[in-house]
Amino acid sequence: MALETVPKDLRHLRACLLCSLVKTIDQFEYDGCDNCDAYLQMKGNREMVYDCTSSSFDGIVAMMSPDDSWVSKWQRITNFKPGVYAVSVTGRLPQGIVRELKSRGVVYKSRDTAIKT
């Protein structure tokens, strides 16, 4: 796991609404999302960080070896970079972003376990 993907503080943590990666708000703004920045372009854009992440999430798991981990299969994060992930993320991406993802062939499934999609 790369050191820059580990949250540097326990305050101001947010989880990506697309992949559930957990970082501080400053890490998302400075580095973007390690898995989704090609689609969400949060790097250097605090407004996009607020739109595409949530401060409300339940549980965290540290995923180091995606191919060997049953947790990564359970959480649907097998194809993502090693890092710290939320078990459930409250909220949804804005409709405009969901439409853009769909036009690029990316299927968005909410990571909010309270909502069935």
Curated annotation (Swiss-Prot):
The keyword Repressor applies. It comes from the Eukaryota. Keywords: Activator, Metal-binding, Nucleus, Repressor, Transcription, Transcription regulation, Zinc, Zinc-finger. It is found in: Nucleus. GO terms for cellular component: DSIF complex. A zinc finger (C4-type) spans 16-36. Pfam families: Spt4 (PF06093). Residues 1-40 are annotated as: Interaction with SUPT5H. InterPro entries: RPABC4/Spt4 (IPR029040), Spt4 (IPR009287), Spt4/RpoE2_Znf (IPR022800), Spt4_sf (IPR038510). GO terms for molecular function: RNA polymerase II complex binding; zinc ion binding. GO terms for biological process: regulation of DNA-templated transcription; transcription elongation by RNA polymerase II; transcription elongation-coupled chromatin remodeling. Belongs to the SPT4 family. Interacts with SUPT5H to form the DSIF complex. DSIF interacts with RNA polymerase II and with the positive transcription elongation factor b complex (P-TEFb complex), which is composed of CDK9 and cyclin-T. May function as a component of the DRB sensitivity-inducing factor complex (DSIF complex), which regulates transcription elongation by RNA polymerase II. Probably enhances transcriptional pausing at sites proximal to the promoter, which may in turn facilitate the assembly of an elongation competent RNA polymerase II complex. This is Transcription elongation factor SPT4. The lineage of its organism: Eukaryota, Metazoa, Chordata, Craniata, Vertebrata.
